[in-house]
Amino acid sequence: AAIQAAPVYFDKAASVEKACGLIAEAGRLGATVAAFGETWLPGYPFFIEAPLSDLWWEAAALYLENAITLPGPETDALCAAARAAGIDVVIGVAELDPATRGSVYASLVFIGRDGSLLGRHRKLKPTHHERSVWADGDAKGLVVHQRDYGRLSGLNCWEHNIMLPGFALICQGTQIHIAAWP
């Protein structure tokens, strides 16, 4: 199921609650996978189009405040929702890495229907103004996840216009690919 719904922008608690409801609905409707867009949690940082304005600084601070850690209470809730619905979930998040003292990544989180964290993919190279908010990812997350229905992978947005990330997933035999865009 492609989740076509907006988050509660820059409110991670409300967005997680909404995501859990959407996951439950997708499960009730018979979906195998619920796929959310790029940084659905807590929302795509559209403020990046207004660089160096007062709005940018205020929004950037709020965005950082609403980024999530992996694992953390937000992923715990999403994992519980996936388990209750009996479906896999792929959701884009703004991931705060405490080890880097403030780096935020545009990450895709893969959650199994058993409620386990299968993995994450950090966007390799943020595009244009995104670089003012997100750090560069790495290739560790270019992984295809074996599921009972096929081999699952995903990339964020403009990564689909770069040949090597997709090629890496193709070489691993991806069959179901989540193309997460804002």
Task: Set out the residue ranges of the language-model regions.
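Active-site catalytic loop in hydrolytic enzyme cores
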Residues: 70, 75-76, 80, 96-182
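Cys-nucleophile CN-hydrolase/nitrilase-fold catalytic domain and related Cys-dependent amidase chemistry
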Residues: 12, 24-113
